[in-house]
Amino acid sequence: FIRVIGSGAYGVVVSAHDKSADRKVAIKMVPKAFHDEIDAKRILREIKLLKHFKHENVIGILDMMPPLANYVEGYNDVYITTDLMETDLHRIIYSKQNLSVDHVQYFVYQILRAL
């Protein structure tokens, strides 16, 4: 099952089920990743960084997938697989739920641990 969970400057993020590992994952699809040199460098830099992250407060990369089509010449799309998180800090901050001081302190603590 695949469900769109977000989108950003570089593409769309969907949730899916990894049958081989029996877990939920997030797949970030970056269309035309190599169309622009600056964007390509940014995406490759993100991939290089993600593969080194091994911390419970930072999402690391699980896998990269080639395009679904077997069309190698036009290879422009990149698929990055990461663990699926229940939510992200952006959604929490912009939700209508009031955050207590304890919530804010806990989020700051988690961010500082990740740094």
Go through each PLM region and give its residues.
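Protein kinase glycine-rich loop
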Residues: I2-A9, V13
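Nucleotide phosphate-binding site architecture
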Residues: G6, I59, H90
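Glycine-rich ATP phosphate-binding loop
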Residues: V12-A33
